[in-house]
Amino acid sequence: MNKQPALAQEQYACVYAWLALLFFREVDDEGLIQLQSAEIADWLALLKRQPALAASVALLEQKIAALSLRQDAQLELAADFCGLFLMTDKKSALPYASQYPQQEPGMIKHLLLEAGMEVNDDFKEPTDHLAIYLELLSHLHFSLGESFQQRRMNKLRQKTLSSLLEWLPEFTNNCFKHDSYGFYAALSQLLLAIVRFDDGKEDLSIVAAE
């Protein structure tokens, strides 16, 4: 049986950047059109070739297809985003590492410093936001294409993945518990599967949709 080749560094980088944007801000009208575009369908088809990602991609594809049947889909997605990621009650899935006891405080700041990165002043969220981890991973995968940095950047990539995996499973579980429509639950499941795949733990079980 032929094994499907792993994703290229540039492909990882682009996927992480895309996911960072979706977890950072609400989907606007333009973003909704992009989600339903042939370009995104092609990207998901590429990811789906990896057996470890296939089930998560299929679930997200179902949720994207269902958007066309959802009245006021953009407004409803915005409400889902707000309820999950911006509220502070027990029915939310806050995207901050500091909200999860498994995570060492300030870890992301150390990782960014090692990577020579700074958070843009326009970024108004706390530094430990999920989107920052994903932007860092995107940067590191692009940097892995430069041979003189490969060893250092790969070591930092592993540290970032390990740090993220300390709390990402609980974040994903919270998304499944509290996202009644399921788009962000499916998105978080795909993210978890990709991070595990990137970390070499693609054989671990993913969160099952209820």
UniProtKB/Swiss-Prot annotation:
Subcellular location: Cytoplasm
GO cellular component, one term: cytoplasm
Major localisation: cytoplasm
Record keywords, A-Z: Chaperone, Cytoplasm
Pfam families: Nitrate_red_del
Gene Ontology biological-process annotations: protein complex oligomerization; protein folding
Gene3D superfamilies: 1.20.120.1820, HscB, C-terminal domain
Family of the protein in this entry: Belongs to the TorD/DmsD family. TorD subfamily.
Task performed by this protein: Involved in the biogenesis of TorA. Acts on TorA before the insertion of the molybdenum cofactor and, as a result, probably favors a conformation of the apoenzyme that is competent for acquiring the cofactor.
Protein name in UniProt: Chaperone protein TorD
Gene: torD
